[in-house]
Amino acid sequence: GIANLIPGVSGGTMAVITGVYEDFLESINHFFQDFRRSVSFLLPYGIGIITAILLGSRLIAKCLEVVPIPTMSLFIGFIAGGVPVLYRPIQKNFQIKNICIFLGAVTLVLIFLFLPTADKSATDLQPYEYILLLASGFLASVAMVLPGISGMMIFMLFGYYQTLMNALSGLLKASTLWHSLTILIPIAIGVLLGLFTACRIFSHLLKKYPKQSYFAILGFVIASMICVFYKMLAYEFQIVQGIVGLIMVLLGFCITYYLSLIHISEPTRHAQIS
């Protein structure tokens, strides 16, 4: 949930490196066919995501304002810690085709990084822009499911990142609750539509083209680290923050790598990729 709040960081990436990505896709894809199982799997993650977004929007904004380099370094570490578990099942499949898929995935994410962005005030929204909010929610949810592409980057491209963050913060205040809901409801509708669409497509690709899919995912994940590092360059570098940043990278790496080791100790689909 917190990963989805930071431009350049993908919630899909965090799902991959913690080992729940394929199960997440399957649960969304078969939500109505296997309702009870899907809800039992998705409910804890849903509660965690909603809680993190509601409580984390202000915290992340404050951390990025006060200690941007350590904060982004922690997320670089989180992402880097998942690379070994992604590399392991594909290490014997380095054909030219797969390498091209990897490079294509990296390139796709970097294209999003260098697209021009804008932002608008929540008070400037026109009636037609609620359709744009729905469309941005749809595309952002597709991006969130796809590892490496940040959903928040989509909102920045549409110019609604600050509008979204203000609306999320406004949910906690009675005076701004209704205004926040008028912004978040069309976004939520778009997110749900995009989520079901994207999960169906990506689940099919993982089943039919597992090796190629994991090369693409690895490319997305590597590129997402480049995106976060690139955004760090916009901040003034200080030696103390740099040292703390390195510590945070190591901390994030160790946490995610430990979680990935727990995941691969269980039977997984990764073992079937050969």
What does each model-identified segment do?
Residues 262-274:
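Single conserved hydrophobic/aromatic residue that forms the stacking wall/gate
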